[in-house]
Amino acid sequence: MSLIPEIDAFLGCPTPDAWIEAALADQETLLIDHKNCEFKAASTALSLIAKYNTHLDLINMMSRLAREELVHHEQVLRLMKRRGVPLRPVSAGRYASGLRRLVRAHEPVKLVDTLVVGAFIEARSCERFAALVPHLDEELGRFYHGLLKSEARHYQGYLKLAHNYGDEADIARCVELVRAAEMELIQSPDQELRFHSGIPQALAA
């Protein structure tokens, strides 16, 4: 059974058509930033293991997640090599930092907020893969379709951990707050195309 309807309901909005248009027009930047996102996702998981080193269920999930994200990183690198896409610096977008500004500074809510933000990032990744797949060539479309299941599983894992460590009413408030901020980041003009960017300014007018 597809998890996309669940993810669509969790997110506040779908990816705008203008972003899809921009991504299809600049697939090199999209692939490089996708590679970077996979590496950052693995790094985030390892950082959580280091920081919350007495939380066994978190350690187990993040260890698996980090391994999966590094495999995805390697897969994107191989795909880029086959397509002749050269490695070049691509700066981080505003998306993840914009969401992490909402994370409260004190525990235990800092962990819960971090996990909710992680759930939104994974959910948006899944939604964007699904949005792109129908428009891509066979090789890239097949690859992105293959990532849907793991991204959906990561979204579920982050959210499950948040519920393990947090108060239900507080989590509901946090989800609503992050959902509103995430929707604004996705729907508003953005200076650059990134995997999680808003609408590139050239197309936002």
Curated annotation (Swiss-Prot):
GO biological process terms on file: tRNA modification
Positions with a binding annotation for Fe cation 2: E69, E122, E151, H154
Keyword tRNA processing found: yes
EC number: 1.14.99.69
Binding positions for Fe cation 1 per the UniProt entry: E38, E69, H72
UniProt-listed Pfam families: MiaE
UniProt effect for mutating K40D: Loss of activity
Catalytic reaction list: 2-methylsulfanyl-N(6)-dimethylallyladenosine(37) in tRNA + AH2 + O2 = N(6)-[(2E)-4-hydroxy-3-methylbut-2-en-1-yl]-2-(methylsulfanyl)adenosine(37) in tRNA + A + H2O
Cofactor remark: Contains a nonheme dinuclear iron cluster.
Cofactor(s) in the UniProt record: Fe cation
Keyword Ubl conjugation: no
GO MF annotations in UniProt: metal ion binding; monooxygenase activity; tRNA 2-(methylsulfanyl)-N(6)-isopentenyladenosine(37) hydroxylase activity
Pathway: tRNA modification; 2-methylthio-N-6-(cis-hydroxy)isopentenyl adenosine-tRNA biosynthesis
Keywords: Iron, Metal-binding, Monooxygenase, Oxidoreductase, tRNA processing
Subunit record text: Homodimer.
Protein family membership: Belongs to the MiaE family.
Job of this protein: Involved in specific tRNA modification. Catalyzes the oxygen-dependent hydroxylation of 2-methylthio-N-6-isopentenyl adenosine (ms2i6A) to produce 2-methylthio-N-6-(cis-hydroxy)isopentenyl adenosine (ms2io6A) at position 37 in tRNAs.
PANTHER family associated with the record: TRNA 2-(METHYLSULFANYL)-N(6)-ISOPENTENYLADENOSINE(37) HYDROXYLASE (PTHR42637:SF1), TRNA-(MS[2]IO[6]A)-HYDROXYLASE (PTHR42637)
Protein name from the UniProt record: tRNA 2-(methylsulfanyl)-N(6)-isopentenyladenosine(37) hydroxylase
Species of provenance: Pseudomonas putida (strain ATCC 47054 / DSM 6125 / CFBP 8728 / NCIMB 11950 / KT2440)
